[in-house]
């Protein structure tokens, strides 16, 4: 499989003709060769997007017509659901059942924003001045740079592509250089759906060249990035060149608060899913369990008993419950954090090593890992490991639980498990996080905004706020009967 970039309506190789091999993290086998773009390719793509916005018709196309094209993209994704899911599993190692669910969600995102495209027509505002009208309209921002991570390649791309197109923007997308396959395929579907040349451009390549140019270019009006906090900070600095609009989702260290009166079996099951789904490579992973002390020992025993039976393997095998980590480099990072946890005095209750099973030796697998006797000042509690590593703390009261949960630079998501709905709502109201789940973990949908407090990011994706990120607000005032002011006589 040999894949190119998509610039100004044409499939092209990199200017340098360089290529990158994409490997399957399950067995390290090569699955594709893709064009390896550079700053020059990014410049070409930005120029195409700039021309398409300034001189083209997309921004001025009736909103309902743009919505029809975005809806068609969603329909095509549904039609190619299985093909896309297979590519996603090859590229990321996740189970194909996860990938199929992702494709359903992705199609829904495009269809949702297609429906919103003509629902943001603005509003009339009563003018306090006589013989005048006043209205507020929303217009597209312009050229959008979009940079997506490797853990949910197409899902994260959809969260950016769909609202940007629905609002009338043009764009340059840069997916992670190690997981670009499904994004390339969807750009093929853009062509079929009728997206005009230059409106949506795709550049493949590393962040330090392609991503850096998108962040710095004065021809880019907005930069949207999902990824690590350090990279996000660099993007903020680079975007200051022309004071771009910025939308950042920078991950989290998400607390899962378990009260003693919670449904025990549900809480254990949800804690496992929160921590170990997709091998913990989820920005909203419930990597911090904060459990009421009176049930701590019982909860830990149940958690360990369940976690040690998680079946690792090939994402295409029906009995596989979790796949590998994305790369050797990332597994090394996870291993370093496990070593740090042990040095800090946490108790390793499970895992903490690579599996010994012969069939898993070629892949980047790591066993589900649980640390107990953790405190909130430990690095493994405070920093995003982004792997199958769960820390467990205890609390004495609701106030103690809230204080520990909020003791973080992050504020993306969190959960509360209790049968006392009053207590649940009270705790949820005090958590400084963009999403709080009660007696559940992980649900999200296109209609509800997603984003974080504190250093988890700026702005929102999904929901109406997700569309508004890609618009500018303009106030238009009209004097119906203008007279000379005669201020300066």
Model-derived regions, located:
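Residues at or immediately preceding the N-termini of alpha-helices
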Residues: 25, 39-42, 63, 81, ...
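Short, well-ordered beta-strand elements within core beta-sheets of diverse protein domains
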Residues: 31-37, 54-58, 146, 256-259, ...
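ALDH superfamily catalytic-core signature
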Residues: 222, 230-375, 438, 485-488
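Glycine-rich loop-to-alpha-helix module at the N-terminal edge of alpha/beta enzyme cores
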Residues: 31-120
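Rossmann-like NAD(P) dinucleotide-binding subdomain of oxidoreductase/dehydrogenase enzymes
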Residues: 122-266, 395
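Residue-level signal for inorganic ion chemistry
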Residues: 28, 66, 88, 110, ...
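Hydrophobic face of amphipathic alpha-helices that form TPR/SEL1-like repeat modules
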Residues: 1-26, 52, 353
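Conserved C-terminal structural/oligomerization subdomain of aldehyde/semialdehyde dehydrogenase
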Residues: 29-33, 220, 311, 338, ...
């Amino acid at each position: 499989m040999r894949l190119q970039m998509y610039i100004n309506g044409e499939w092209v190789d990199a200017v340098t003709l360089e290529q990158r091999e994409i490997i399957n993290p399950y067995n390290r086998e090569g699955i594709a060769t893709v064009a390896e773009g550079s700053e020059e390719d990014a410049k070409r793509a930005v120029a195409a997007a700039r021309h398409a916005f300034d001189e083209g018709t997309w921004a001025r196309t009736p909103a309902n017509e743009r919505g029809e094209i975005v809806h068609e993209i969603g329909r095509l994704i549904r039609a190619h659901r299985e093909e896309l899911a297979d590519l996603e599993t090859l590229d990321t190692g996740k189970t194909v059942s996860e990938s199929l669910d992702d494709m359903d969600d992705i199609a829904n995102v495009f269809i949702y924003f297609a429906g919103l495209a003509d629902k943001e027509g603005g509003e009339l505002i009563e003018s306090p001045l006589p013989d005048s009208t006043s209205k507020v309209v929303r217009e597209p921002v312009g050229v959008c740079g979009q940079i997506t991570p490797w853990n949910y390649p197409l899902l994260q791309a959809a969260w950016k592509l769909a609202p940007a197109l629905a609002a009338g923007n043009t764009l340059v997308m840069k997916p992670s250089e190690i997981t670009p396959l499904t994004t390339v395929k969807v750009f093929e579907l853009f062509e079929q759906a009728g997206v005009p040349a230059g409106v949506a451009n795709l550049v493949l390549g590393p962040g330090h060249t392609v991503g850096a140019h998108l962040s710095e270019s004065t021809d880019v009006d907005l930069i949207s990035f999902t990824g690590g906090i350090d990279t996000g900070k660099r993007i903020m600095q680079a975007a200051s060149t022309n004071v771009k609009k910025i939308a950042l989702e920078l991950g989290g260290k998400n607390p899962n608060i378990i009260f003693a009166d919670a449904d025990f079996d549900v809480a254990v099951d949800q804690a496992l899913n929160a921590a170990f789904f997709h091998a913990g490579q989820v920005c909203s992973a419930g990597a911090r369990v904060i459990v009421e002390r009176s049930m701590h020992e019982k909860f830990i025993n149940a958690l360990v008993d369940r976690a040690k039976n998680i079946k690792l393997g090939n994402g295409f095998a029906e009995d596989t419950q979790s796949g590998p980590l994305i790369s050797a480099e990332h597994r090394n990072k996870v291993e370093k954090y496990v070593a740090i946890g042990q040095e800090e005095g946490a108790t390793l209750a499970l895992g903490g090593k690579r599996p010994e099973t012969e069939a898993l030796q070629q892949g980047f697998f790591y066993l589900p890992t649980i640390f107990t006797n953790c405190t909130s000042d430990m690095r493994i509690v405070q920093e995003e490991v982004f792997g199958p590593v769960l820390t467990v703390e205890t609390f004495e009261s609701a106030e103690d639980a809230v204080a520990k949960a909020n003791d973080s630079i992050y504020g993306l998501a969190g959960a509360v498990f209790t049968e006392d709905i009053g207590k649940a709502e009270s705790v949820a109201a005090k958590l400084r996080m963009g999403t709080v789940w009660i007696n559940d973990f992980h649900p999200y949908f296109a209609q509800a905004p997603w984003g974080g407090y504190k250093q988890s990011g700026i702005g929102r994706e999904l929901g109406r706020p997700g569309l508004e990120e890609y618009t500018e607000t303009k106030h238009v005032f009209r004097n119906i009967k203008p007279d000379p002011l005669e201020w300066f006589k």
